[in-house]
Amino acid sequence: MRRHSETDVEEQTQELKTITQLQEQCRALQIQGVKENMDQNKATLALLRSNIRRGAQDWALAKKYDQWTISKACGKNLPLRLAHCRSTMEVVREKLRKYVFDRVNMHNLLIHLVRRRGQKLESMQLELDSLRSQPDASKEELRLLQIIRQLENNIEKTMIKIITSQNIHLLYLDLLDYLKTVLAGYPIELDKLQNLVVNYCSELSDMKIMSQDAMMITDEVKRNMRQREASFIEERRARENRLNQQKKLIDKIHTKETSEKYRRGQMDLDFPSNLMSTETLKLRRKETSTAEMEYQSGVTAVVEKVKSAVRCSHVWDITSRFLAQRNTEENLELQMEDCEEWRVQLKALVKQLELEEAVLKFRQKPSSISFKSVEKKMTDMLKEEEERLQLAHSNMTKGQELLLTIQMGIDNLYVRLMGINLPATQREVVLSNTLDLNSKLAYCEGKLTYLADRVQMVSRTEEGDTKVRDTLESSTLMEKYNTRISFENREEDMIDTFQFPDMDHSYVPSRAEIKRQAQRLIEGKLKAAKKKKK
């Protein structure tokens, strides 16, 4: 059995040795394979790094070339170059293509507009040449043209009048509606005023009640403050008396202790050890024991009194109780200061309430008469504003009519003076593109001054005067405003028609007198209103 077991063990060891050898060979092969893989990876890494470096150089070169091409494409346009410096070549190419396409479209549009304007200019030039080639118009045509211009001016003026009248009518309707709404809102305002008066009366009664309550509260606070102050003073005095008594007792105890210690020390020093007998020692011991007992009983009595006064059960609580009493005393002093400040504030509040009570007491209560007077004043003011509005409307219509008549007269004068040519020496006023009233007036002024100078230079004759009068009468014969006035009784017109029954009726007051009378009337009304309020 032993041999068999030894052989088995040897076989197992042989197998294990072979296994370990195989494992070592496998490990060596694995290490060799790993080294080969590492060498291959290093070679690939070097190749990849060189490729990356080459790619980076190519990319930098391509980027530089793109920037060069972009700057060359943008030219001297610095904003465009800065806008596209960070973009890629494809994006810049697309943007530049779009920009060039837009510019080409704009160029084509401008060329088209230039061609159209050239065609229009040619047509207008042809029309101008045709108009220049036409013969001069006859007098009848000029007269018809003048009539047409007058009719156009009249139509424009009537249209302006119609528009202004419509605007005035709309403004009148708006003002009427606004005044109606305002008038409808007056009863609500009066109700609000009545409610305010009622609220003021209720607030006045509440303020009176509040002032009475505040006065009662202040009296109660004053009474409580006096009581608390008196009780606090009594407590403070009692506490001080107790503390003084306790301090005196403690001082007595300390003095007794010190004197007893001193006496004992002296006795120990003076005592002769050789001569002292046992009897004297016993007697002295008895005396000292009785004295100590009396002293201890006195001290315990004093301590008990202090405990009962301070209300504590232990001796070591006495100091803390004294400190607590000191803190309470300080707190009470602070509370007294706060109460004093509160008392001052309450006094100020009472004074303010008394003043408000006096103001409200002597204030007049509102009545229905004041409301009626306010309503009457408001209606009078409304009527005055309506009258002012009507007056402003009438003045505005008069002003518009006057302006229209002036414009019509200036237009007619301008049309009539257009045919008069000024001499070469006198400079003609250059008219603006928009013929406004001022330019027309300046034009007419130049022509009229020239005509006035010519009239002064020409000598007047009766034949010329009659011709002018006849032409004026014939030209204004069919006008509406040209009415005949009959002067039948010329002598009666010279008679004074101001027949007054009395000289007082013929008196017309001056402006200062009217102002004085108005001031007197206003002062009288104000005095009457003040008397009613009182």
Curated annotation (Swiss-Prot):
Stretches assigned to coiled coil: 10-54, 136-209, 323-396
InterPro entries in alphabetical order: CCDC183
Superkingdom to which the source organism belongs: Eukaryota
Keywords: Coiled coil
Record keyword Coiled coil present: yes
Protein name: Coiled-coil domain-containing protein 183
Chain's gene name: CCDC183
